[in-house]
Amino acid sequence: KKLANNHDNILVHDAARCCLPQDALSRLIQEAGTKAEGGILAIPAADTIKRSDTDGQILETVPRTDLWQAQTPQLFQAGLLNRALSASNLNGITDEASAVEQLGIRPLLVQGDIRNLKLTLPQDEFIIRLLLNT
C-alpha cells in the first residue's frame, strides 16, 4: 500500500538526535517544505578541520568557510526520496541528502541548532543529560 503521494513531504529523523528544538524543526518545514530539492538542518563547521594520512599525521588544514555539519531531520518529497533511495549505487551514502545528491540534486541547507546533538559516542550522553536537565 502506498503510504504517501509523490509530492508529500517526508521528514527523516535520527532517533539518536533526541534534543531537536521545535524552532529548528519549524524553520526546516518553512524554508524547505516548498522546495522540490528538499532540505536539511545543518550548522556551519566551527572547529578547525584537519585532513590526515593513514598514520594519523596532518596533511592539511581544510578551510571551513563552506563546510556544514549535517543534522536531522531531513525533508524531501516522497517521490524524490524514493527515487534517491532506490538508486543502484548507494555506496558511500551516509544520509538521505547524500542519496539525493547522487541524483545531481542539491538540497537546501537550513540553519540547524547546536542543541540538536547526536548521541553517538559515550561522552555524548554526558552533554545530552546536562542539556535535558536544564
Each language-model region and where it sits:
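Short acidic donor-binding/metal-coordinating loop in glycosyltransferase active sites
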Residues: 7, 13-16, 72
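Short beta-strands and strand-loop turn motifs
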Residues: 10-13, 108-111
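Glycine-rich "substrate-gating" loop/helix at the edge of Rossmann-like oxidoreductase active sites
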Residues: 16, 89, 114-117
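Residue-level signal for alpha-helix termini/capping positions
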Residues: 4, 30-33, 133
